């Protein structure tokens, strides 16, 4: 079952299509401004969610696609600024998301337990919420944009295949245990992130140097 929503639709309300197991694809019109909480939660056969290129949607609200376990790829529209908590929680087949340059906040657990294989975060992103990418076990390398001021705890914790996280600046706040001990933080020597690695006994690799320091 494929649903093309009316071109005049502005809002999809809370749980509007939740637990609709026959839904395979949905097309969102440019007029859509609000994608409500848990709107498509537990649509376990949803394969595609397509936004119009000129979509006015600015926020993917809490749990909007929670447990859409067959959703594989997503292109978010240009005006999206916030991805709400658990928006894509347990989307186990979600391999790739293309983020817009307008994105400012990824809230808590937004992509927890997803199948993401790569992560290209946009410059302009300000905040990464708690456990935002917790147990995304297919991620290997991540670069944090220099615009990010807040990295909450456990952002990449439990990502067992994650090899490196590169942080080339000093965010205003970095919470505890953003990565596993098996992961290497790439940072500048003498930076706050260097001291953070000391505090949590994390491996680090200095940018511009060849050696890895193990504490």
Regions found by a protein language model. Give the residues of each.
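Structural signature of tandem-repeat unit edges
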Residues: 1-11, 21-34, 44-59, 69-82, ...
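Consensus positions within tandem repeat domains that build extended binding/scaffold surfaces
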Residues: 13-16, 36-39, 61-64, 84-87, ...
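A structural signal for leucine-rich repeat
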Residues: 18, 66, 89, 134, ...
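Short glycine/serine/threonine/alanine-rich loop segments
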Residues: 202
């Amino acid at each position: 079952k494929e649903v093309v929503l009316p071109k005049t639709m502005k809002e999809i309300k809370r749980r509007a299509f939740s637990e609709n197991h026959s839904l395979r694809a949905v097309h969102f019109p440019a007029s859509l401004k609000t994608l409500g909480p848990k709107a498509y939660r537990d649509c376990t056969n949803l394969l595609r969610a397509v936004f119009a290129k000129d979509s006015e949607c600015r926020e993917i609200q809490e749990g909007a696609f929670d447990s859409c376990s067959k959703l594989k790829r997503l292109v978010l529209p240009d005006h999206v600024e916030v991805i709400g908590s658990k928006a894509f929680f347990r989307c186990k087949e979600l391999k790739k998301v293309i983020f817009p340059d307008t994105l400012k906040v990824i809230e808590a657990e937004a992509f927890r337990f997803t199948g993401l294989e790569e992560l290209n975060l946009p410059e302009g992103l300000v905040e990464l919420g708690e456990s935002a990418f917790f147990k995304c076990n297919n991620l290997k390398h991540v670069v944090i944009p220099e615009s990010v001021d807040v990295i909450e705890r456990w952002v990449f914790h439990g990502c067992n295949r994650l090899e490196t996280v590169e942080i080339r600046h000093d965010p205003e706040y970095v919470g505890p245990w953003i990565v596993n001990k098996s992961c290497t933080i790439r940072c500048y020597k003498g930076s706050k992130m260097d001291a953070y690695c000391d505090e949590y006994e994390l491996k680090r690799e200095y940018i511009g140097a060849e050696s890895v320091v193990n504490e």
